[in-house]
Amino acid sequence: MNPSEMQRKAPPRRRRHRNRAPLTHKMNKMVTSEEQMKLPSTKKAEPPTWAQLKKLTQLATKYLENTKVTQTPESMLLAALMIVSMVVSLPMPAGAAAANYTYWAYVPFPPLIRAVTWMDNPIEVYVNDSVWVPGPTDDHCPAKPEEEGMMINISIGYRYPPICLGRAPGCLMPAVQNWLVEVPTVSPISRFTYHMVSGMSLRPRVNYLQDFSYQRSFKFRPKGKPCPKEIPKESKNTEVLVWEECVANSAVILQNNEFGTIIDWAPRGQFYHNCSGQTQSCPSAQVSPAVDSDLTESLDKHKHKKLQSFYPWEWGEKGISTPRPKIISPVSGPEHPELWRLTVASHHIRIWSGNQTLETRDRKPFYTVDLNSSVTVPLQSCIKPPYMLVVGNIVIKPDSQTITCENCRLLTCIDSTFNWQHRILLVRAREGVWIPVSMDRPWETSPSIHTLTEVLKGVLNRSKRFIFTLIAVIMGLIAVTATAAVAGVALHSSVQSVNFVNDWQKNSTRLWNSQSSIDQKLANQINDLRQTVIWMGDRLMSLEHRFQLQCDWNTSDFSITPQIYNESEHHWDMVRRHLQGREDNLTLDISKLKEQIFEASKAHLNLVPGTEAIAGVADGLANLNPVTWVKTIGSTTIINLILILVCLFCLLLVCRCTQQLRRDSDHRERAMMTMAVLSKRKGGNVGKSKRDQIVTVSV
């Protein structure tokens, strides 16, 4: 191998670090303490408020008074820092940063709505004119005109068929209906004088119950006065229409499809041919159609009606009664007479007057009904909170039991400007919902128990050190607990999820309360009192729920119950369906959940508030006793003897040290006395005094 090859295979030389100063400098800066990491539960603190600083100053002053320390600016600052340090230095258990406590919460009157169904009780609908339309009256609606017509998108569920009006599947169709009264006349050519009212009503599909016999249909017949067999006679005041509820001989079907079967037992008056006693063929069918192609045109354009026939005209299904629809399938619900007051106000009503005359044509009697109209009456119907009207392109899906509507409007009143190209859905505010709420601490029934528990954790975790700290600062456990309680409440930061629910529910509470305020000018009216009673009934139901529940101390507008949320038992899809208002087999079983929550609340009610916390404090104070520490160590006789010998040895050692210190003190005292005597002599005796001092000290 030649030298050149040996040189190529030689290992490379190591580079020398000429300047090691930077490394040394970095080594000097290295520390072994743990780096302060930002935990997930760490929150950005807000600047202290004036009230917090004032309270902190009061606590510091009280602490200095208890410890009998002079109040100076320095001592006040140190006391305040100690109080803050005491509050923020409470130990956090392992894994508490990632802990997540989820409980069931009851939120009353959330910002949610649900559809009014055929199984709900009738609602109050107010009209502005009780002369032509029966029912409660209120001519001061709407209460907030500036809020009428607000846009909204809805997607809600339902259990029973919802109440909907309009030309759409699942909604009751509108139609024109007539109500007629007659006044007998003595004229030889005029049989009767008629007064008739035409207005928007509910459209019948068939005249009689479909798929039901007469006998079977009678079981759905409501209790009430049967309609008269004669046409009601006009009262003396021709400007007043007397309404009298009655039950017709047969019912009409308003709806019979997959959404349910809805019937009405109110009379549906129309003109018929009276064929009794006629020998020739007599068409007994009704003449005036029950349904017009254009509803508004039939009420606006046609101001004259003339019916002619060789057979006498008779008004069928007599009676002046309003429609009262009710559902009979798949469930049976109550009557809803209030729906007609909404439809009749969607267009003005028309007032007719006329008569039936008798003539002779071709030697046969000829009957003519002549009706004319020149008077219309505009109407307005309104509902009051918690009820509202959703107007727009409403779509009801029976398969999924959902109702959707995009770009709809929220209204409380309907008048003659309404367009029947839209649909009307009755909705109301939700009385309350059950939702899971997460917190970063366990459920507590009162703030005192929460604070005592946290302080006691810190005391017991550092009991042996904390006892000497208490002795050093001359501060008792009661003072520490009181200080931590007040300062902890002042510096407390709520959980974000609870804050979200709180703000969510607080805004809706303000909204419903503002809408439900009763006008002082109408406070004496009986209708407002009735609506207030309905509203107060919902409030009482909510209060009844809250009185039965044991709630967490840190919430006021809604109730966090002690029932832990079990995701495996109630998955979030069930909660979502509950929020949407759907009640099917997959929806949250509210009745079962209420039973579980009430049982959990009763279990917490059996405990006297504060008893458990006070018992914990007593146990904590017992653990602070040093004698208990010795007892735990000295559990055998041999160890006890050893401890006694150690104590005697320590006592003997203390006695010997005390005697030695006493001798040294006596020697120093004698020396000082000798020095004092010598200092009084003159200079000639100084040497002697020094020798005497030396002799005295050496003795």
Swiss-Prot record:
GO terms for cellular component: plasma membrane. One of its GO terms (molecular function) is structural molecule activity. InterPro entries: GP41-like, HERV-K_env, Retroviral_env_glycoprotein. Residues 654-699 are cytoplasmic. Specific enzymatic cleavages in vivo yield the mature SU and TM proteins. Residues 466-486 are annotated as: Fusion peptide. Glycans are attached at N100, N128, N153, N274, N355, N372, N461, N507, N554, N566, N585. ERVK-19 has a type 2 genome. The HERV-K(HML-2) family contains type 1 and type 2 genomes depending on the absence or presence of 292 nucleotides at the 5'-end of the env gene resulting in Env proteins of distinct sizes. Despite their overall retroviral envelope structure HERV-K(HML-2) type 1 envelope proteins lack a predictable signal sequence. Subgenomic RNA transcripts coding for full-length envelope proteins have been detected for both type of genomes. The surface (SU) and transmembrane (TM) proteins form a heterodimer. SU and TM are attached by noncovalent interactions or by a labile interchain disulfide bond. This is Endogenous retrovirus group K member 19 Env polyprotein. It comes from Homo sapiens (Human). The lineage of its organism: Eukaryota, Metazoa, Chordata, Craniata, Vertebrata.
